Every structure is written in C-alpha cells, then in structure tokens.
Amino acid sequence: METSLRYATNSRSLKIHAKEKFPVNSKTRLQLHGELDTGAGVPSYFCAMIRYFFHEASTNLGVGLHYDKREKLRCLVRGKKKFPVITDEVVTFNIKGRCDFDQDLVQRNAKGAAEFDWNIWKFQKDQDLRLRIGYEMFEKVPYMQIRENNWTFNTNLKGKWNVRYDL
C-alpha cells in the first residue's frame, strides 16, 4: 500500500492518503485510494477505478467512481498520453485529461493539461529529481512540480500550492 502525508493551502489540515493497486492482468489494474482529513477526523474521499495501460503507446485510461464528502458519488473518466522528447524518456511531453460527472451523468468538472517532465536520475547519490512544468487548459493557469525522492511540491500562478511526503 502506498501512503503519503499531504498538506495544501485550500484545506488547511494535514491529510493522510492511501492507495492500493490490484493487478487484473498485464494491462489492467483495479486502483483504490482514499484520504483521511486529520483536522476533521473523517475521510475526505474514496475512489475505485479500473485503469487500462497501453504500454506500447505510453497511454493509460481510467474509469471509476469517486465518493466525496461534499459532492457525494461521481463518475470519473481520465486519460494520459506520454511522448518521449528524448529517446530514453528523460524528458517527456504529456497530455492528460479527466472529467467528473455527477450521478445523473451531467458534466461537473473537466480538467486538461499539457506538460513537460524532466527526470534527473541520480541527481546526487541516492537522489532522483523530477521537474514538471505544465499548463492547465480549463483553468488557464501554468503550474510546476518539483519531486525529490519522497517529497513533492506543486504550485501554480494563482498562488495555490501543496506538499506531499510519501511514507
């Protein structure tokens, strides 16, 4: 099980996130994840998703259900496509999108982004680094991510930020 501690400017409380991936076959897995809000002492959300991977095309698709304490049950569809900029995939250009629907299948929330990833393996001894710069198309806002081994810092030009530590 993958677990992490997360803190964001919009929540003002520490969250504990857990994710488990169950392989169905070589290209498909069931992914369960959820989050506990330590400030309120209750779960923030729970999600169950089937993810399908097209390894030869560096593409993945996912369909699932998401239960949020505020918006109740939602349907979720997401996808991501990677394009290597350099042959060893140290630098990639990624296109990703997702759309949430309410129970009546009316569109609720769409997100889409284009981004560049630069993975620097062995930046220092026992230290890997990833730099990501992207643009969220629906919110029209640039963003960036810095990831160093277990630490991840995300921010955008609207002043939002979050930090994650993978346990």
Curated annotation (Swiss-Prot):
Signal peptide: none
GO biological-process terms attached to the record: regulation of monoatomic anion transport
Main location: plastid
Gene Ontology cellular component annotations, sorted alphabetically: chloroplast outer membrane; etioplast membrane; nucleus; pore complex
Chloroplast intermembrane domain ranges by topology: 32-55, 82-87, 121-127, 153-158
Cysteine disulfide partners in this protein: none
Family stated for the protein in its record: Belongs to the plastid outer envelope porin OEP21 (TC 1.B.29) family.
Membrane-related topology note: Multi-pass membrane protein
Name of this protein: Outer envelope pore protein 21A, chloroplastic
Keywords for this protein: Chloroplast, Ion transport, Membrane, Plastid, Plastid outer membrane, Porin, Transmembrane, Transmembrane beta strand, Transport
Lyase found in the keyword field: no
Biological role: Voltage-dependent rectifying anion channel that facilitates the translocation between chloroplast and cytoplasm of phosphorylated carbohydrates such as triosephosphate, 3-phosphoglycerate and inorganic phosphate (Pi) depending of ATP to triosephosphate ratio in the plastidial intermembrane space; in high triosephosphate/ATP conditions (e.g. photosynthesis), export of triosphosphate from chloroplast (outward rectifying channels), but in high ATP/triosephosphate conditions (e.g. dark phase), import of phosphosolutes (inward rectifying channels).
Cellular compartment(s): Plastid, Etioplast membrane; Plastid, Chloroplast outer membrane
Membrane side Cytoplasmic: residue ranges: 1-21, 66-71, 98-110, 138-142
Record-level Gene Ontology MF annotations: porin activity; voltage-gated monoatomic anion channel activity
Transmembrane domains' residue ranges: 22-31, 56-65, 72-81, 88-97, 111-120, 128-137, 143-152, 159-167
